[in-house]
Amino acid sequence: SNAGFNGKTSRQATDLAIAEFDHLSAGDAPFYLWVQYFDPHVNYIPDADAPFQGSLQKDLYYQDVWQTDRELGRLFRHLEMSGFFEQGNLVLTADHGELLGERGAYGHAFWLDEEVLRVPMLIRSPLLPAAEVDLRVSTVDLLATLTELTTGKSLVTDGRSLLPIAR
């Protein structure tokens, strides 16, 4: 199931995700829920209550990141209250970073700088211990990782399972 994107704000994406999660989790079948937050993308249109002020691109970006973080917190609290984390797996990552004036560059489409390539990847599962791992991995590894995490089986792909690192 898919919630977010298509012009939805972070608040709207979270509302959709919570409603869809509640619907899917009421059944007995395993499910996959994809939530995409699009606020921290050009054109930056922050909420009026964002704590950062200013009109520069970097200020507007940080305001959008703040409101997305706020909405992720709301979603995670809902998941926590539902008991999801006792049995469910959660992955949080990003498609790319952003240059905000570093070395005079803006955007992400034409550069391979650290600010563009380095994105967060969080995997939370009742099957894994809490840990922080500072290694270069790739989002291409997610398919093999999630397959092994949910089925116990290895999958031959371009990526590799990250479970040996996480355990």
Please state what every model-predicted region is:
Residues 1-167:
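Catalytic domains that recognize anionic headgroups
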